[in-house]
Amino acid sequence: MSKVCEICGKGPSFGNNVSHANNKTRTTWHPNLQKVKAVRNGSVKTIKVCTRCIRSGHVTKAV
């Protein structure tokens, strides 16, 4: 569970890189995860959160 957001569950997505010669190679796109000290269930914990969850206010940062 290392590349998964702990709030929304967003994880890696898979697909192909396609060249001009139409060659296809498998690739992986990972979410932009940040380690954040956040308040969860009344205690401060370090969690991995995607930047979309941070920007939209789903995480309350610990001061």
Curated annotation (Swiss-Prot):
Signal peptide: none
Keywords on record: Ribonucleoprotein, Ribosomal protein
Molecular function, one GO term: structural constituent of ribosome
A biological process from GO: translation
Gene3D superfamilies for the chain: 2.20.150.30, Ribosomal protein L28/L24
Record-linked SUPFAM superfamilies: L28p-like
Keyword Oxidoreductase attached: no
GO CC terms, sorted: ribonucleoprotein complex; ribosome
Pfam families linked: Ribosomal_L28 (PF00830)
Family from the record: Belongs to the bacterial ribosomal protein bL28 family.
Protein name as catalogued: Large ribosomal subunit protein bL28
Organism: Geobacter sulfurreducens (strain ATCC 51573 / DSM 12127 / PCA)
Phylogenetic lineage: Bacteria, Pseudomonadati, Thermodesulfobacteriota, Desulfuromonadia, Geobacterales
